[in-house]
């Protein structure tokens, strides 16, 4: 490359006399592509003769500038002739300071101001465009100048600032004769951007600040408007005027995009808007270029720098690795990730050099890479290494760019796919220079160095950033901590001996009860299922209130941006500041508890939840596509042939206009199809197969292209439709490659195991249509699906039992539920409709209801029911049990999931279902077998002792307890007798202080360990809690709606009617 091809640099030398002419000397700059442009130090002198000219003419200078319009001129006043100051860029030379002598020429101080105003931090991304800034003046070799902290501005006011400290330039010889190479100084200390000092004569230079609307280029004339600002990109500028006092960010980006397209018309980019960054020039800040994040950043006279990034900004993930090293703590300190105490005498944990946070060694591999590098006080013993010297301005830059980084993370999430597509670009801050613990690794003591202590790997950051974020609230419950733990929200100690605080049962986030209301809704889910994502919502931009979301907490639930104040050792009332054993620390902490911080009064029992054994009603959103294709068809009512694109799914057949549209001509639900058959073998029929419904018959004559494969295609269509009509594909009964022992499968026409006539699945499919995607529940012997009766359209629940899953000795278990359902007939028991048996399966058809009692409890406002609603439901349950016990039928698996509701009202009718565990037990008989769900079983069953019908009454007591409190009554870790005898444990003030004593007495009568002391159904119905006028009135309203009196008795009418007259109550059941 020829020297003339380099960007040009002008040198100006002025004696102290103000009448001297300004002489310019042309320099060419040399840059190496392998070295960052702001680290370049070698400049080649292009003309040695020009350097000797100290009194050149102004016309020479003007001619040089006109000849080289891309060159820069920088002037500087000095008491010596050889002072030097210049400024350039690597990729394209800026002409911000270029002036023709006949135009408005800047004063030397103006040049100084312009040169210093373009100084930016090395941390800023604008260095991707290669800004360079050097200042030099002659002095003796090796000399160092002291800093001047005070200076006088042009108004005579004294101000404070920082100064340049430079090395001495050393001329070196080059191979080419007559040429010299200068090693330019290296900037060590960043100065105040608007202040330049001359140390040669200890004089102070006052920079010139130009007016806001002063134009430096006439590339575009400004328009008249209320808001005027300028766009700049390299040597190009443009003035923009808009109406109003603000411009929207979208309009500003559009103006910048149009500006770039105008000045670079030959450069085409399909998604240029993704690469554009907008900065404003702010001379008052340390970083001159400030990222524009809001419309208020652009004011009248603002200079907007348009920067084109190297990668799309919506694919960048900002990663700030922690600088961890082993640390010995002299006072008790807590982990900022899990909140537990760092145990040990020495080397208890890890401390981040950047942000000062403290972690367990076991937590090091789980913490997010979100260090903010803002430790309040950096130890003076550890100096800044060159690789980390640019961290000085890190806080200011991140403060101004915090929200832009968050928005970049939000935009980056959908860019990563599972199929191996391009992953988002990762921007790692300069804290991490390749070593495992950060840039200061070599400056730590050797004994504290470690190559294993680092945050989670980058692939986890990518997976976390691209993961869909939802506002999932924490599920807090009272927890007793065995180790001293701090609240991860307020960073204060959780005090007490037991039940010190609240812990999320999913992500194990710990906090005070009073702080639980202020914790962000960012639960990360079960920690056992996702070990490596225990708090990975770093830089989450989903929440609009980012200032709150980025508040001072870090924990297992969601590890936010690291806080400025880490978990410091407890002081004052929170603990003794002196080092000592953990025992004395805990004792001091407990003795200093304030009065207002009392131990939580909530129950430590397990919250009510759906037991794994039963499924909640689910339904897939998208039906499975079974077959599709073009079909030509007609009906028995219309002979005109029509062509449509048929799609067969689990719900029906849909006829679309074409393959891609969503508009359809007609839909045939599967429950309306009565039969599908091929055409007769004779050649008289002009169709391939027919679909018979209750309204008409569809004849399929083929596909639009009548080929040889039409008959084969017709066969596949009939097979697919018949498969869709079949109830459910039977599950395999093969285990480990060998078929298990099964019941003897009778042939068609024989009597089945349950005494029912064997029927084919085709016959069953003609009566009922089962929706395989609508699973209502799953029990011991089978799965319950939703279905519909084809003829009358009644919705039913079909329990499908696979006989091949049971060995021969379990045949009685298959027969028990069907026999009980056939035997009972009561409004409080689910209605049995029909039972059909095929060669390998049994179909039990029952009525379908709206939901279950558990769903009603969980969906209530407080997570529990009121006493009035609970009394209403329990009264119906007791009446159904009274009927079953009269028939010597014990349910044995009574729980809210098996109590169905026929409506979504506040006072619905309930019915008992799922008699898979039911037993026939006499009044004085006992059974010994495995039955029921452990959470609702009586102690005698859990201890494998004999049980009788009082087993159901224990289950009723548990149901009443969970309905009123929303939690299970017992904790599995303690003996059940001890828990029952401990009234404080069983009935904590929250919420039992709001519940009547009669309700507690009713529960105590049912939850009796001794069966002889447990309430019977009759005694429970006559208990005082179940005897009040409001309950009787509500039940009478229900009976009126059902049309049958099945809960209350006529003998009670006289008593309650007298109550109405005595209290002047108007009955609502009439």
UniProtKB/Swiss-Prot annotation:
Positions of ATP binding: 776-784, 799
Sequence ranges assigned to domain PH in this UniProt record: 624-726
Disruption phenotype: Increase in adult life span. Increased levels of daf-16 translocate into the nucleus in response to heat stress. Hypersensitive to killing by bacteria.
Region (Disordered): 42-77, 152-178, 200-222, 537-583
EC number: 2.7.11.13
List of residues that carry Phosphoserine: 925, 929
Gene3D superfamilies recorded: 3.30.60.20, Pleckstrin-homology domain (PH domain)/Phosphotyrosine-binding domain (PTB) (2.30.29.30), Transferase(Phosphotransferase) domain 1 (1.10.510.10)
Gene Ontology terms describing biological process: antibacterial innate immune response; defense response to Gram-negative bacterium; defense response to Gram-positive bacterium; determination of adult lifespan; innate immune response; intracellular signal transduction; phospholipase C-activating G protein-coupled receptor signaling pathway; protein import into nucleus
Principal location listed in the UniProt entry: cytoplasm
Source organism, top-level taxon: Eukaryota
One CC-aspect GO term: cytoplasmic side of plasma membrane
Cofactor section: Mg(2+)
Tissue and organ distribution: Expressed in the late embryo, all larval stages, and adult in the intestine and in cells positioned near the posterior bulb of the pharynx.
Enzyme category, top tier: transferase
Chain ranges of zinc fingers (Phorbol-ester/DAG-type): 321-371, 473-523
A molecular function GO annotation: ATP binding
Record: active site: 893 (proton acceptor)
Activity regulation behaviour: Activated by DAG and phorbol esters. Phorbol-ester/DAG-type domain 1 binds phorbol ester with low affinity. Phorbol-ester/DAG-type domain 2 binds phorbol ester with high affinity and targets the kinase to the cell periphery, enabling phosphorylation and activation by colocalized tpa-1. Both domains 1 and 2 appear to bind DAG with equal affinity so may contribute equally to translocation and activation.
The keyword Transmembrane is assigned to this record: no
Catalytic activity: L-seryl-[protein] + ATP = O-phospho-L-seryl-[protein] + ADP + H(+); L-threonyl-[protein] + ATP = O-phospho-L-threonyl-[protein] + ADP + H(+)
Function: Converts transient diacylglycerol (DAG) signals into prolonged physiological effects, downstream of PKC. Acts in the intestine to regulate both innate immunity by promoting activation of PMK-1 and also stress response and life span by acting as an upstream, negative regulator of the daf-16 transcription factor.
Protein family per UniProt: Belongs to the protein kinase superfamily. CAMK Ser/Thr protein kinase family. PKD subfamily.
Protein name: Serine/threonine-protein kinase dkf-2
Provenance organism: Caenorhabditis elegans
């Amino acid at each position: 490359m020829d020297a003339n091809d380099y960007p040009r640099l002008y040198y100006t030398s002025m004696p102290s006399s103000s009448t001297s002419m300004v002489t310019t000397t042309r320099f060419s700059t040399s840059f190496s592509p392998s070295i960052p442009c702001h680290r370049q130090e070698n400049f080649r002198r292009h003309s040695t003769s020009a350097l000797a000219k100290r009194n050149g003419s102004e016309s020479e200078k003007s001619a040089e500038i006109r000849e080289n319009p891309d060159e820069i001129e920088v002037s500087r006043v000095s008491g010596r002739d050889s002072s030097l100051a210049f400024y350039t860029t690597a990729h394209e030379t800026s002409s911000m300071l270029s002036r023709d002598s006949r135009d408005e020429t800047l004063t030397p101080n103006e040049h100084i101001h312009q040169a210093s105003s373009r100084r930016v931090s090395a941390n800023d991304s604008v260095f991707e465009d290669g800004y360079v800034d050097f200042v030099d003046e002659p002095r003796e070799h090796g000399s160092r100048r002291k800093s001047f902290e005070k200076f006088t501005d042009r108004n005579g006011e004294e101000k404070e600032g920082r100064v340049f400290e430079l090395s001495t330039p050393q001329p070196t010889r080059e191979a080419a004769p007559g040429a010299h190479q200068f090693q330019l100084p290296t900037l060590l200390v960043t100065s105040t951007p608007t202040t330049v000092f001359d140390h040669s004569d200890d004089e102070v230079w006052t920079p010139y600040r130009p007016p806001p609307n002063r134009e430096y280029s006439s590339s575009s004339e400004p328009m008249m408007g209320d808001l005027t600002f300028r766009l700049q990109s390299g040597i190009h500028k443009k003035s923009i005027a808009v109406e109003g006092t603000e411009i929207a960010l979208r309009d500003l980006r559009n103006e910048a995009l149009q500006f770039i397209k105008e000045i670079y018309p030959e450069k085409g980019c399909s998604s240029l808007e993704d690469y554009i960054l907008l900065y404003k020039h702010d001379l008052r800040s340390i970083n001159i270029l400030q990222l524009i994040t809001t419309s208020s950043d652009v004011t009248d006279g603002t200079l907007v720098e348009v920067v084109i990034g190297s990668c799309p900004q919506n694919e960048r993930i900002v990663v700030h690795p922690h600088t961890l090293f082993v640390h010995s703590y002299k006072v008790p300190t807590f982990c900022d990730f899990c909140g537990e105490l760092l145990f040990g005498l020495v080397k208890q944990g890890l401390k981040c050099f950047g942000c000062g946070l403290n972690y367990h060694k076991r937590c090091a591999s789980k913490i997010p890479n979100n260090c903010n590098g803002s430790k309040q006080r950096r130890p003076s013993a550890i100096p800044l290494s060159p690789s980390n010297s640019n961290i000085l301005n890190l806080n200011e830059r991140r403060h101004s760019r915090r929200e832009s980084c968050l928005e970049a993370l939000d935009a980056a999430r959908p860019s990563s796919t599972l199929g191996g597509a391009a992953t988002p670009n990762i921007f790692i801050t300069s804290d991490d220079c390749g070593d495992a613990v950060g840039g200061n690794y070599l400056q730590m003591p050797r004994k504290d160095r470690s190559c294993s202590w680092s945050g989670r790997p980058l692939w986890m950051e990518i997976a976390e950033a691209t993961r869909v974020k939802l506002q999932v609230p924490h599920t807090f419950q009272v927890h007793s901590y065995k180790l001293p733990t701090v609240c991860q929200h307020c960073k204060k100690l959780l005090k007490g001996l037991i039940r010190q605080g609240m812990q999320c049962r999913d992500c194990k986030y710990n906090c005070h009860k009073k702080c639980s209301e202020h914790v962000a809704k960012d639960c990360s889910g079960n920690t056992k299922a996702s070990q490596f994502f225990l708090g990975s919502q770093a830089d989450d931009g989903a929440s609009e209130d980012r200032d709150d979301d980025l508040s001072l907490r870090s924990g297992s639930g969601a590890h936010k941006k690291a806080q400025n104040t880490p978990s410091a050792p407890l002081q004052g009332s929170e603990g003794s500041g002196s080092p000592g054993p953990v025992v004395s620390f805990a004792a001091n902490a407990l003795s200093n508890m304030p009065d207002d911080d009392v131990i939580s009064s909530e129950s430590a029992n397990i919250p009510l939840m759906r037991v794994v054994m039963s499924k909640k009603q689910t339904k897939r959103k998208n039906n499975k596509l079974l077959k599709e294709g073009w079909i030509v068809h007609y009906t028995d009512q219309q002979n005109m042939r029509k062509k449509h694109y048929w799609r067969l799914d689990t719900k029906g057949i849909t006829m679309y206009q074409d393959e891609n549209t969503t508009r359809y001509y007609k839909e045939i639900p599967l429950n309306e199809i009565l039969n599908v058959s091929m055409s007769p073998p004779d050649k008289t029929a002009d169709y391939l197969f027919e679909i018979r419904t209750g309204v008409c018959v569809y004849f399929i004559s083929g596909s639009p292209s009548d080929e040889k494969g039409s008959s084969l295609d017709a066969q596949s269509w009939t097979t697919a439709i018949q498969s869709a009509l079949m109830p459910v594909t039977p599950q395999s009964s093969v285990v480990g490659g060998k078929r298990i022992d099964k019941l003897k499968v009778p042939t068609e026409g024989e009597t089945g195991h349950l005494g029912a006539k064997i029927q084919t699945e085709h016959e069953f499919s003609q009566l009922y249509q089962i929706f395989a995607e609508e699973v209502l529940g799953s029990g011991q012997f089978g799965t319950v699906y939703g279905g519909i009766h084809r003829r009358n359209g009644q919705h039913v629940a079909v329990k499908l039992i696979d006989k091949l899953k049971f060995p021969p000795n379990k045949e009685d278990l298959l027969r028990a539920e069907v026999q009980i359902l056939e035997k009972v007939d009561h409004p409080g028991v689910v209605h049995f409709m029909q039972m059909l048996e095929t060669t390998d399966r049994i179909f039990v058809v029952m009525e379908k209801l709206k939901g279950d009692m558990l769903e009603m409890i969980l969906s209530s406002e407080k997570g529990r029911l009121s006493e009035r609603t609970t009394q209403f439901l329990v009264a119906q349950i007791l009446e159904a049990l009274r009927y079953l016990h009269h028939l010597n039928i014990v349910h044995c698996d009574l729980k809210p999931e098996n109590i169905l509701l026929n409506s979504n009202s506040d006072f619905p009718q309930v019915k008992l279902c799922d008699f898979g565990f039911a037993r026939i037990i006499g009044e004085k008989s006992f059974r010994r077998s495995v039955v029921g769900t452990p959470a609702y079983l009586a102690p005698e069953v859990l201890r494998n002792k004999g049980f009788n019908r009082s087993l159901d009454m224990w289950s009723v007591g548990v149901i009443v307890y969970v309905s009123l409190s929303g939690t299970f009554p017992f904790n599995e870790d303690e003996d059940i007798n001890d828990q029952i005898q401990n009234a404080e444990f069983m009935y904590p003030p929250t919420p039992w202080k709001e519940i009547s004593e009669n309700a507690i007495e009713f529960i105590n009568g049912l939850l009796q360990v001794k069966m002889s002391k447990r309430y019977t159904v009759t005694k429970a119905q006559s208990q005082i809690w179940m005897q009040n006028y409001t309950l009787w009135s509500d039940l009478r309203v229900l009976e009126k709606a059902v049309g049958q009196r099945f809960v209350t008795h006529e003998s009670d009418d006289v008593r309650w009617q007298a109550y109405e007259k005595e209290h002047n109550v108007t009955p609502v059941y009439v």
